[in-house]
């Protein structure tokens, strides 16, 4: 049997991690949660991650820095950004670097579902 794709969730807010994890699992994907970008980068799940949902504003390494670190490591993981501070210049920077989504918190679960379906569903 094929293993479900892994969606990693990086957010410093416990409630966001719990909500996103529940949503991801309801779609049949495996969810791995991390409270920081640094924890994700050190995780054994890094190379198995099929899609990443990440906050922009976090203590320590922020979401854009995480995106840059992944690119520097040649990791081509599709990233969906969620943020409580949706600045246009940040969105443009994230998308220019390859983000597949950029959404404001509180995020509508349907937009995350649509984005995950686009990235992870075959055909």
Region annotations inferred by a language model:
Residues 35-36, 62-65:
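Acidic catalytic/metal-coordinating carboxylates
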Residues 65, 86-101:
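Alpha4 helix (beta4-alpha4-beta5 surface) of REC/receiver domains from two-component response regulators
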Residues 89, 107-117:
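C-terminal output helix
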Residues 58:
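Receiver (REC) domain active-site loop signature in two-component systems and cognate sites
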Residues 76-86:
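A short, hydrophobic beta-strand element within the central beta-sheet of small alpha/beta folds
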Residues 52-55, 83:
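Active-site residues of response regulator receiver
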Residues 14-32:
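Two-component/phosphorelay signaling modules centered on CheY-like receiver
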